[in-house]
Amino acid sequence: TALNASYVARDELIASALAQEGMEYIRSVRDNNYLNNRSSWLTGLSTLGCYNNAASYCIVDPTLGDVNTTPSAISASALASVPVLKVTSTGLYNHRTIATNTNTRFKRTVQLTTVNGNEVKVMVVVSWISAHQSYSVTVTDNLQNWL
């Protein structure tokens, strides 16, 4: 129906924004490594369980701002257990368990794969279920070493 189509379109817009936010978060980690003269452009990323591991995914929560512990690895077999994003009353999406947050239907995962010594492929997937149907939006980008 037209109503269902409008809900799907709304969810696709939200998912696209969440996927892009995840990509921008990973990009900001790379940028901050450069700006802070860290020894590796992948500091905070290369030690994650989802780095060069096709059987593992990470979740990111840019609102926490902790690049070393925020992304946590989730095995492919446990992908169904990825926590849903929550939303605040002001529309901010996060993973915080706070009484005022409301669960959403959206889940966001990240994978990082080495292309070569100076390039990493980042894939962010936002998935959700609506009316018993699975949907997803995928954003990929290759990040370069600026160091």
Q: Where are the regions a protein language model picked out?
A:
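Low-complexity, Gly/Pro-rich coil/beta segments used as flexible assembly/activation regions
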Residues: 17, 23-147
